[in-house]
Curated annotation (Swiss-Prot):
Organism placement in taxonomy: Bacteria, Pseudomonadati, Pseudomonadota, Gammaproteobacteria, Lysobacterales
Role according to the record: Part of a binding-protein-dependent transport system for phosphate; probably responsible for the translocation of the substrate across the membrane.
Name listed for the protein in its UniProt record: Phosphate transport system permease protein PstC
Organism: Xylella fastidiosa (strain 9a5c)
Cellular component GO terms held in the UniProt record: plasma membrane
Subcellular location: Cell inner membrane
Membrane-topology annotation of the record: Multi-pass membrane protein
Length: 324
């Protein structure tokens, strides 16, 4: 009696390679689609704002970007005042937030006891999750009265009389203004910058810091001569990330800046930013006014994009220097 053996089906190496190649192809296709989706969304957002602002651009021409006159009744639009307010408030925020963030990060990594590092770090990170409107309400009901009663009179009396910089600190004690908006923005971006600084400070090799301490260096000398040079690229990247956040903030700034489209060198007078002006006026804008606001949105897009490009170029330059 003879028996026939039925060969067992097995997957050949060639078939397995074919399935792997197909899976890899579809995976690459999925990743490409994700990247294409982001790029298309980015370009379409910019082009839609530019297309929506074509009427204002045709009406005003290039003067839209450098004129200070903003009169919707007469269809006269100049973007220089909100552009100035956007840049100045962001710079004030960075001047305050960067040194404070550095101090927080160095305290949590080098000075604070271990039992205190985690709760303090968590509390600071939670600040990043607070809605911006909460910051705006805090600024309006807490910061503005303090500015009105204490800070603005002090600045007027002691700094407003100085040559050159005195003009920046002269104004009525209203409390609302560019300086108040800068303070609120600083509080908002501190969690982002300090979290990045803390994480990169933890990457500094312990041997480097211990060697500096063994040679008699103080904590300040270690932070300035060891920690910062080692983490310079990442720190600069975190600073520009915070700057980009400050440039586009809307609601918190709208609460405390005063929303006045008048160019003034004083930081104590009401002003406006691009985002705040769009948020306040877009809902009730006429067709021509809406076109001007859309063109302002395109300007804000370009400013933010330029900041990120500059940050990227600086990081590339630093990495090349470090590589050499």
């Amino acid at each position: 009696m003879t028996s026939t053996l039925i060969p067992k089906e097995t997957s050949t190496p060639g078939g397995r390679d074919l399935r792997d190649a197909r899976a890899d192809y579809f995976f690459k296709l999925l990743l490409t689609a994700a990247v294409a989706f982001v790029l298309i969304a980015l370009v379409s957002a910019a082009l839609s704002m530019l297309w929506g602002g074509r009427q204002a651009l045709q009406l005003q021409g290039v003067s839209f970007f450098y004129s200070t006159e903003w009169n919707p009744v007469e269809n006269k639009y100049g973007a220089l005042t909100p552009i100035y307010g956007t840049i100045v408030t962001a710079l004030i925020a960075m001047l305050i937030a960067v040194p404070v963030s550095f101090g927080i990060a160095f305290f949590l990594t080098e000075v604070a006891p271990r039992w205190l590092r985690r709760p303090v770090g968590t509390a600071i990170e939670l600040l990043a999750g607070i809605p911006s409107i909460i910051y705006g309400m805090w600024g309006l009901f807490v910061l503005v009265p303090v500015m009105t009663d204490y800070i603005t009179p002090f600045l007027n009396d002691h700094i407003g009389t100085l040559p050159l910089i005195g003009t920046l600190f002269q104004g009525p004690p209203l409390g609302i203004g560019t300086l108040s908006a800068g303070f609120v923005l600083a509080i908002m971006v501190i969690p982002f910058i300090s979290s990045i600084m803390r994480e990169v400070f933890l990457t500094v090799p312990t041997q480097l810091k211990e060697s500096a301490y063994a040679l008699g260096s103080t904590k300040w000398e270690v932070s300035w001569n060891i920690v910062l040079p080692y983490t310079r690229s990442a720190v600069i990247g975190g600073m520009f990330l915070g700057l980009g956040r400050a440039l586009g903030e809307t609601m918190a700034v709208a609460f405390v800046i005063g929303n006045s489209v008048r160019l003034s060198p004083s930081l104590l007078t009401p002003g406006t930013t691009i985002a705040a002006l769009i948020a306040n006026d877009f809902g009730e804008a006429t067709e021509s006014y809406r076109s001007a606001l859309l063109l302002l949105g395109f300007v804000l897009f370009i400013v933010t994009f330029a900041v990120l490009v500059i940050a990227r170029l600086m990081l590339l330059r630093l990495s090349r220097k470090e590589g050499n």
